[in-house]
Every structure is written in structure tokens, then in C-alpha cells.
Amino acid sequence: MHRKAFLLAAAVLVLTCAPAAADDTVTHHEFQADCTITHHQPDDPIVYPNQPGASHDHTFLGNTTTNAATTLQSLLAAGTGATTCLAPDDLSAYWFPTLYNGNQPILSTWSQVVYYKSGILDYTKVQPFPQGLRFVVGDMMATQSQFQNAPGAIEGWECGDSTHNWDFPSFCVQGSQANIRYQAPSCWDGVHLDSADHKSHMAYPDRVTLTCPADHPVPVPMLEFKIAFPVSGDMSQVRLASGRGYSWHYDFFNAWDPATLAALVTHCIDGGLQCDSRGFDQYKPDRGAALGPDYRLPGR
């Protein structure tokens, strides 16, 4: 590394590690992954591994190689930059059921947001995901009531001024977008990277105390998919590949570079910041960034 680049990297690291000021009020504890769609196909490497075409259609973000045969090894083998996420060392795979208007898949061309937040009260205790952790969030077989009352539910489907729709609204103002946000469980059992139902190794924090249960003691980042679809007007023919709006769910297969993910979790979640994909909080610029201008750890 050239001396000038080395000094710049060192300066970024020093700024990144600066402690919070005493009056630094904490309002958020998060960072985000900004990723565009890679492709859509009827594969699900978690639920139907090595069975191409066995699933309903999914829309994929992140790692460009994801298919039915995907493993941790294949995600990592894709190599740095084989992702549509801004951080080139995030080789994770993210996917959800494809949205259709009639028989036409609705695929956005803009960046979608996956938030990494604290789901527990003591945000300083959140730990990075172990590499290879994978899970399914939500339930495609849920009833409308179950979807509405699920621990991951926030505001249902939204478009324009219409919120808290637990199925697709019948009409969205022309030019608006259909949006959905849904939160993942953020307590890990500390042992299993997957489970038979792809859910039991994860749990939601207690709703009152916001602490992890004893059988899932490890607090990890709470994912929150915030997905926007370019569809509006008459919504009567809008559906998910999995069914009605309340069948919404998504999958995550972690393949972050461990050091990069740890830097973002430590700086942004544990540090009580509202960070972008670079680990920079524009409201507290004195705290620096977790990653360099290229969205990588300095020196990588």
C-alpha cells in the first residue's frame, strides 16, 4: 500500500474508533445494506436445496450467483464484488416472493433497503451474525390475522397515505409505490446455523423486556426488509408468488466478510448510530465511518 493510502486508511480507522461524546444522544442503532435486484427464479436454497424449480418464484438481492444449489461455500467463492449491494464484501443472499400484477412480475430497478438494527433494549450487546447463518422470516401459510399480529409486523402494506393494510389495498394512488416492512427475529440459539423448519434456531426478543430468551441467548442484528414495488392504480390483480399479501416472508443467508460485518455492528449498532451502507451517520459526522469511501474496510 502506498504511504498516502496507508495514512488515509489509518485516519479513517482512528476517526471510526473515536468514542461517543458524553452528550451524544442515542436515537438509533442501525446500519443498512442497499442492494438492487439480481434476478428472479423459482428457487429456494434454504427450503428446497438442490431442487431447482421446486419453489414458488423468488426475487433475489445481493449475491449474483444465488440459485437452488447455493451454499456458504458457493456464495463466498463468487468473490468480492459479486453482489448488487453497495458493500462489496457483503456476499450474502437475500430473497422474497416475487410480486405480480396479473402474470407480470413487478421488479424494481432501484436499490432496496435491508436494515440491520438492534432488536433488544441493550443495543451495545448485539453481536455479528456467524457466517453461514440462514433463516426464513414470516410464514407464507399465515392468515391475515396471524400476519397482522406477528412479532415482525410493522405497518403492513403501504402506498401513498394508505397504511396498515394487512393484505394488498384495492387501489393505490397512481404513481405511488407498494411498500412493505417486516422485522426478523434477532435472538440466536448460539449453536445451529439452520434448523429443520429454518426458524427454530432463531427467536424474537420478549416484547415487554426486549431481552433474548434463555434458550436463544445470543443477540444478533435484527433485519428489517424495506421493499418498494413500482405498482399503483388498480391493485385487484396484484399478488405474491406465494399468495395473498399476508403470505409475505423472506429469506437470508449470511455470507458477509466477518471483519466487515463486525466493524459495522460495533460502530453503528453497538455505537448507537443511524448509519448508511458505509457505516456513516450524517447527523453525527464526528463519529466517522466504519468503512472507507469504497465501502470496504480500510486496507482491504
Residue ranges and their predicted role:
Residues 1-7:
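Bacterial N-terminal signal peptides that target proteins for export
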Residues 23-55, 59-182, 189-300:
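Primary mode marks residue(s) on the alpha4-beta5-alpha5 output face of response regulator receiver
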Residues 18-22:
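Sec/Tat signal peptide C-region and signal peptidase I cleavage site
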